[in-house]
């Protein structure tokens, strides 16, 4: 069966990833943890442009993509994360790997079912997120 799940995360973090190999590891670990299959090796690059300084990373998966950018000039740093899949998605697994890696100070997420438009399936933030939800 084909699904259309789109997860967006916006989080503030104290210790942003600045090394490309750590960003690649995060994406590889996430892909494995959620039972997806990468169709290319994850790619990460540090962008050293004032106003847009930070890490950008992407991996193509059989069912679409996972990407993020971290703006580390900000304090705390900001990460925008995007996962789209035509496969099943266990939100709790993604949130667990994300929070274990980035230890966000503040986190907001929204999961859309895009089968017939943009139907909000789930949303939350650190103020309402409990370990039992992960």
Regions found by a protein language model. Give the residues of each.
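Polybasic/polar functional segments that serve as interface/processing modules
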Residues: 1-134
